[in-house]
Every structure is written in C-alpha cells, then in structure tokens.
C-alpha cells in the first residue's frame, strides 16, 4: 500500500506483455532493459502526476536503489539493470516462470 514506488512500477511494466517494446526482461535472471527509456519515464511521470519526468530523473531514482540493494546497473550495457532484491519470495515466481508468463524466449547458454 502507499504510493507506488519506481521499482514496483518497473515490475508492473515488465509483467505487461503490451509494454515489451519499451521495457523487457533480457532473459538472464532478473535483468531487464529499458528499450525506450524516455517512454518509460513519461509513463512514470504520468503515474506520479509529474509531467516533467524524464529519463535523467528516473535514472536518479534507479541510482538511489543501488545502495539499498534493490536494483543494480549492469556494467557496460546501456539502459540495462537487474533486480537484486529477493523478487522470487516477493512474487512467488522464479525469473524463468515469469519470463514464460510474459513470453520471453529462454536463453541458450549451453
């Protein structure tokens, strides 16, 4: 309860099949990529009634999570982040189960 937090909002988009063109799982655990960071920021601003929201401000919100061990940035990849908190117990799904639900193709790492 309470106002929605950025990480919850991102998770909401990530579990919505219709949002896969702007944000999606990479198929590697809880890693995800903002394919259209400006659109993600616009929607976040709309949700929070902050019309001036942009990716720069949104990424500041994401950086705030680094120390809290909620989300980390994936080094060397632009707009790629990873949930490092225990999402599995929070959601009751493994990343693989969640990927399957939203239609993320499994990775071939063999």
UniProtKB/Swiss-Prot annotation:
> SMART domains from the xrefs?
ETS (SM00413)
The residues that make up the annotated DNA-binding region are 1-84
BP terms from Gene Ontology: cell differentiation
Q: Could you list this entry's UniProt keywords, alphabetically sorted.
A: DNA-binding, Nucleus, Transcription, Transcription regulation
Q: Which residues form the signal peptide?
A: none
Q: Name one Pfam family in it.
A: Ets
Where mainly located? nucleus
User: Where is this protein localized, as stated in its record?
Assistant: Nucleus
Summarizing the function annotation, the protein's role is:
Probable transcription factor.
Protein name from the UniProt record: Protein C-ets-2
Organism of origin is: Lytechinus variegatus (Green sea urchin)
